[in-house]
Amino acid sequence: MYAIIETGGKQLKVEEGQEIYIEKLDANEGDTVTFDKVLFVGGETVKIGNPTVEGATVTARVQKHGRQKKIIVFKYKAKKNYRRKQGHRQPYTKVVIEKINA
């Protein structure tokens, strides 16, 4: 059984036992989080949401928080001695999908 959930402005296909990296959640490590925005549930029977599947939830456990690899944003204008360098590391949360309730 699998489901498509929406979290952090992104849609993800998840299965039970899968580890996924999502946008940072306001939860502590070891906490259980529930995703209510389930757009699709697949398996033996298929349920398609309009826009979400009523009564369907996905339960996950927060494993850790972290920050992704640094990206560099560099702007310059040729021949004008104008340079701006900025770095960014996006925070993320690693969760393990425990149960899909449909």
Swiss-Prot record:
Keywords: Ribonucleoprotein, Ribosomal protein, RNA-binding, rRNA-binding
Organism superkingdom: Bacteria
One GO BP annotation of this record: translation
Matches recorded under InterPro entries: bL21-like (IPR028909), bL21-like_sf (IPR036164), Ribosomal_bL21 (IPR001787), Ribosomal_bL21_CS (IPR018258)
Disulfide bond sites: none
Record's GO cellular component terms: cytoplasm; ribonucleoprotein complex; ribosome
GO molecular function, one term: rRNA binding
Keyword set includes Calcium: no
Subunit structure: Part of the 50S ribosomal subunit. Contacts protein L20.
NCBIfam families tied to this protein: L21
Function, as annotated: This protein binds to 23S rRNA in the presence of protein L20.
Family assignment from sequence similarity: Belongs to the bacterial ribosomal protein bL21 family.
Protein name: Large ribosomal subunit protein bL21
Species of provenance: Geobacillus kaustophilus (strain HTA426)
UniProt gene name: rplU
